[in-house]
Amino acid sequence: MDALALIMTMAAYLLGSISSAVLICRLLRLPDPRKVGSNNPGATNVLRIGGKGAAVAVLLCDMLKGTIPVWGGYFLGIDPIILGVIAIAACLGHMYPIFFHFKGGKGVATALGAIAPIGLDLTGLVMLTWLSVAVLFRYSSLAALVTVLVTPFYTWMFKPQYTLPVAMLCCLIVFKHHQNIRRLLSGEEPKIGEKKLIEKNSA
């Protein structure tokens, strides 16, 4: 990895470490999303505690955290594999933010933003998959898991040179959802829009 790639990777992690959910909730005088609901600082939990407007703002900001560094690396001519490393760095920043005591979100929106520079056709198909599962089953985590499992295949269809880095990114997201998987299997996972609070130790 050359100096430029290393700088972009570090910048991606630092940008990812800016917790949109926490900052927007502070701005709107909402509860800290790390302490209420699912205890996850992401758009779905902000939807539960703050409504659609706040959730959309968090979603867009989280996506930009992935899009900006990857698009920047793309225009600088960085190799696809290193672009994958940059995307993973942005998601790691979101999941384990240095500015917020390493307590972050699941990385789904940031990963979507990181994939967006590959192409609008791929991005649209990924979003359609998530939306379809979410509408059918009303579980955000299930929609995310199904989507990340099929996204490497979608990538292979459109831009096969990016399949490996996208697969690496998807594996990271599945790992971050291990507690959601356990709650889905036990029937304890809250559905989209539910106000039900989850015990802090189950987040």
Curated annotation (Swiss-Prot):
Pfam families registered for this protein in UniProt: G3P_acyltransf
EC number of this enzyme: 2.3.1.275
Please classify the protein's predominant subcellular localization into one broad category: membrane
- Compartment list: Cell inner membrane
Where does this protein act, in terms of pathway? Lipid metabolism; phospholipid metabolism
User: What is stated as this protein's family in its record?
Assistant: Belongs to the PlsY family.
Q: What does this protein do?
A: Catalyzes the transfer of an acyl group from acyl-phosphate (acyl-PO(4)) to glycerol-3-phosphate (G3P) to form lysophosphatidic acid (LPA). This enzyme utilizes acyl-phosphate as fatty acyl donor, but not acyl-CoA or acyl-ACP.
Q: What is this protein called?
A: Glycerol-3-phosphate acyltransferase
From which source organism is this entry?
A: Vibrio campbellii (strain ATCC BAA-1116)
- What does the organism's lineage look like at the top? Bacteria, Pseudomonadati, Pseudomonadota, Gammaproteobacteria, Vibrionales
The gene is plsY
